[in-house]
Amino acid sequence: MSQTTTLILLPQTTYDGGGNANVYTVIGNSQPAAAYYLGNRDLQTVNINLTQVTGNIVIEASLATTPTSTDWFKVYELEANINAAANSAPLIASNASVYTNINGNFVAMRAKVVNFAHGVVNFTKLSY
């Protein structure tokens, strides 16, 4: 069965800490996950597109229909660092378009950028 629903977890987000070590966290809006509309569906695909990013992209899920701040838990994390060692995973991720399949009977999902210091998160999308 092909995926028919695509939602934006985090729209294009740009930040340049100006080289003075200012970092912050960006939290995207809650979106319904596969189980919200489709009952026992448990496969979601997350697509992340980054340009020169230093920060951690965190995908969180919830089992609550109307999640509060304490209902969220981490299901995936991508570490990106434009200043990392050559050919390291964080350096490669800093300019990447990646996807990952996330299994789980989740009701809601969201994306966060933690320790965001630099770069452009072009998009973070959820499909099911």
Roles of regions detected by a PLM:
Residues 54-77, 122-128:
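Short, surface-exposed beta-strand/strand-loop-strand elements in extracellular ectodomains
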Residues 44, 57, 109:
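Residue-level detector of short, conserved catalytic/binding motifs and their immediate flanks
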Residues 51-55, 116-117:
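Short proline/glycine-enriched turn/loop motifs at strand-loop junctions of beta-rich domains
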Residues 7-8, 15, 27, 56, ...:
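Serine/threonine-rich, low-complexity intrinsically disordered segments
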Residues 47-49:
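Short edge beta-strand/loop segments characteristic of extracellular beta-sandwich folds
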Residues 10, 17-39, 45, 62:
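Short Trp-Ser/Thr-centered turn/loop motifs at beta-strand boundaries
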Residues 26-29, 33-41, 74-128:
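Beta-sandwich interaction modules
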Residues 1-20, 123-128:
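Short, intrinsically disordered N-terminal pre-domain segments
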